[in-house]
Amino acid sequence: MGDAMPARLQLERLLAEDPARLAARMRAPAAARLLAECRAAAAQPARPVLRSLHHFACTGGTLFAKSIAALPCVRLLSEADPFSPLGYQGAFAPRDLISLAKAGSSPPGQAVLARIFQAGLAALAAETRFEGGDLVLRDHSHSHFCTTDACGSGLPQRPSMKELLQADYHLLSLVTVRHPLDSWLSLLRQSWVHFTPGTLEEYARRYHLFLDHYADTPILQYEAFTAAPEAGMAQICQVLELSGSAGFQERMAAQSLSGDSGRSGTSIAARPRRAVPETVAAELQTAPSYGRLCARLGYDPDPQGAAWPGAAVAGPASPDAG
């Protein structure tokens, strides 16, 4: 090591020179220029990889998250959103800097909250890479697209998780979906309708905004995953560039995550569809955005039809035509 360090320093100094000067000093100018160009490229490290998972509430997101968390070397953060108006609102949050800041005597704006979130995530991402693991972030998309902040014809006036992360990371993202009628019925049952008007049409309109925002992102259907879990996990691992999917179903029972409110039991299997109340059935006649949403995601809008047409995995959803 004693002799290697001076030689390394000499090489670094040599490659730090201007390519033209370096070429003049070496017998092979082309090689010298190539070395200098390689050094210049190496001085700009590539953005680290970060995986992200996006879905609406009551679409099987926790099942997907638990399955991914069961993979070896995965560290999963469940339901993250630094701007969420939901959840614990008390002043006592000794471990949560964002909650402390919002409950403090001079609450900061979105820009500061974003920097707090990004700094904490950067530390955790770096530690995960150092340990040889893969960090997966489960976005709480419901907080963005299904709260009163999202009123109006466009997107909410706040950054999305994608916008918060894409400058610092090479994002590998996946959107997961479920039949919109089934997820809407579950949302009603959980009393999680946090927007106005609280109608199926408004829900579908917001769903379109979500899909528009994550256009070109691969989509996996909940129904496809529950029908063929091993094939679905192989697809997830391909999209997110994760390894070691074998045996994930046996390991996922040990995972405990937030958002685990709808599904009971540990087996991955399709569940019976809920009955459609008369009030919701009446809404189906006046919800054109719902019909377009079903067509966009490859579902039959008829509540008497099959929940899933049988296609294994859907590609990116085309923009809403309505």
Residue ranges with predicted function:
Residues 134, 139-247:
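PAPS-dependent sulfotransferase catalytic domain
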Residues 72, 240-241, 297:
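A broad structural signal for alpha-helix termini and local helix breaks/kinks
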Residues 79, 247-250:
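A short, aromatic/hydrophobic, helix- or strand-capping loop or linear motif
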Residues 305-322:
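C-terminal non-catalytic accessory extensions
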Residues 1-130, 138-140, 249-307, ...:
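PAPS-dependent sulfotransferase catalytic core
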Residues 61, 110-118, 157-158, 200-204, ...:
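A structural signal for well-ordered alpha-helical scaffolds and beta->alpha junctions
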